[in-house]
A protein has these predicted regions:
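N-terminal secretory signal peptides that target proteins for export/translocation
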Residues: 1-13
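Beta-loop motif signature
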Residues: 44-47, 52, 58-88, 93, ...
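Boundary regions of SH3-family modules and the immediately adjacent low-complexity/disordered segments
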Residues: 38-53, 87, 99-133, 141-143, ...
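Bacterial N-terminal signal peptides
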Residues: 16-31
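Signal peptide processing junction and immediate N-terminal pro/mature segment
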Residues: 29-41
Length: 194
């Protein structure tokens, strides 16, 4: 799953009771990070020293998405929306390989990206050229029982203020409220954003 890490245990099967007792004793000496415990792997850091993958947003209204990490590579696509969230999936020197909400990947110069967190609401529900879009409810608190502030169409861009892993507080077109985190593309499942 994107953005989450598998936690598991390495199962140890000591050959004798003595070996089992030594293992327990060794665990007591070295603490919970002993031989059998295997925690979640640390996120990989890219050339920038920042975690990969991670969400960022576009700084400019015109950002070239290139087929490779350099200006000598052809432009495959031009993003035309500042603030659009993209996921950094790889880094090479000053270039970042990114993926957008539709799954398109390519390379962008790192200076064209911002750490500002944004999200697209229900991008998988956008129906191009068809009438009414799917709606998400923006609420006045982080609960399904909270009153509605606004209804927001699929594909709308939101600014993320905070996320607690279940709900995100966002601003959309002059409205502020809470939306369920799984309805956003731009924040990982269970990710906390402060």
């Amino acid at each position: 799953m994107r953005g989450s890490f598998h936690k598991g245990l390495v199962h140890c099967q000591p050959r004798t009771v003595t070996a089992a007792l030594l293992l327990v004793f060794a665990q007591a000496l070295v603490g919970p990070t002993g031989l059998c415990a295997q925690g979640a792997p640390a996120p990989a850091n890219g050339a920038s020293g920042l975690p990969v993958p991670r969400f960022v947003s576009l700084k400019s209204d015109r950002v070239n998405l290139r087929q490779g990490p350099g200006t000598e590579y052809p432009t495959a696509w031009v993003f035309r929306r500042a603030g659009l969230p993209v996921e950094v999936i790889k880094e090479f020197e000053s270039w970042r390989q990114v993926r957008d909400a539709e799954g398109t990947t390519g390379w962008v110069l790192g200076s064209m990206l911002s750490g500002r967190r944004t999200a697209v609401i229900l991008p998988w529900e956008v129906k191009a050229g068809q009438g009414q879009q799917a709606l998400a409810v923006l609420r006045d608190d982080d609960s399904e029982r909270a009153g509605p502030v606004a209804q927001v169409e699929a594909g709308v861009l939101a600014n993320i203020i905070t996320c607690d892993g279940k709900w995100c507080r966002v601003s959309v077109g002059g409205f502020r409220g809470y939306i369920e985190q799984p309805k956003l593309w731009g924040a990982y499942k269970d990710e906390v954003i402060k």
